[in-house]
């Protein structure tokens, strides 16, 4: 096979900055994929305005996972998250996923109905969680490593729940990154929303 064609096939199988060798063979679960990406891109600034690197987000997510575990939340359980300010709205879901749990987002703003429909175990209402979680270790030892096919999120809109797997979110995120032309060597500036190369 000509090298050019081989390179094009390899690039076509790449999801964002996750090369096929990383998501097809050695990473059977989400945790392994994220660990690999953090080793590779940990010091890269992701959100320039907040000076947040992948490593900082990764450490905070592990603290959140430890905090959730201390609250009795188990892997595969659902956690309802109310709207929060950025960057907490990004860090907290990663903490939930680090634990191996699933996030519930209720666009209908009917908390009681969402809890009943999804059997959510806890409702996270504000960003004080970040402060509470800071006393927990930045290393989380997973008891369960979610597979790419496991549920990652439930989005409730117009009383209908839409269920997404880790793989669904990975592919959708990749599609968005390609649409806005944001690549692995760039950071995102949020004020105003522009790409920084």
What are the residue ranges of the model-derived segments?
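N-lobe entry segment of adenylate-forming
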Residues: 1-52, 56-71, 75, 99, ...
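Short, well-ordered alpha-helices that flank and scaffold nucleotide-derived cofactor binding pockets
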Residues: 66, 94, 174, 178
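Conserved helix-loop-beta element of the AMP-binding
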Residues: 119-122, 134, 138, 169, ...
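Short beta-strand->loop structural element characteristic of the AMP-binding/adenylate-forming
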Residues: 80-83, 89-93, 97-126, 163, ...
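Conserved AMP-binding
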Residues: 82-87, 93, 151, 156-159, ...
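Conserved AMP-binding loop of ANL adenylate-forming enzymes
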Residues: 81, 167-171, 177-197
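Short alpha-helical
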Residues: 87-88, 110, 171, 196
């Amino acid at each position: 096979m000509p090298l050019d064609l081989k390179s094009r096939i390899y690039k076509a199988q790449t999801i964002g900055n996750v090369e096929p060798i990383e998501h097809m063979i050695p990473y059977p679960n989400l945790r392994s994929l994220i660990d690999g990406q953090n080793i590779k891109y940990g010091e890269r600034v992701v959100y320039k305005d907040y000076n947040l690197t992948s490593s900082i987000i990764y450490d905070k997510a592990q603290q959140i996972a430890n905090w959730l575990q201390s609250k009795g939340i188990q892997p595969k359980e659902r956690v309802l998250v109310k709207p929060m300010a950025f960057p907490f709205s990004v860090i907290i879901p990663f903490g939930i996923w680090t634990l191996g749990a699933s996030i519930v987002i209720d666009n209908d703003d009917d908390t009681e109905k969402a809890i009943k429909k999804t059997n959510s175990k806890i409702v996270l209402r504000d960003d004080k969680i970040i402060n509470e979680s800071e006393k927990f270790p930045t290393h989380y030892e997973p008891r369960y490593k979610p597979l790419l096919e496991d549920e990652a999120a439930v989005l409730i809109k117009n009383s209908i729940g839409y269920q997404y797997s880790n793989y669904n979110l990975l592919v959708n995120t990749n599609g968005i990154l390609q649409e806005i032309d944001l690549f692995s060597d760039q950071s995102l500036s949020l004020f105003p929303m522009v790409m920084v190369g």
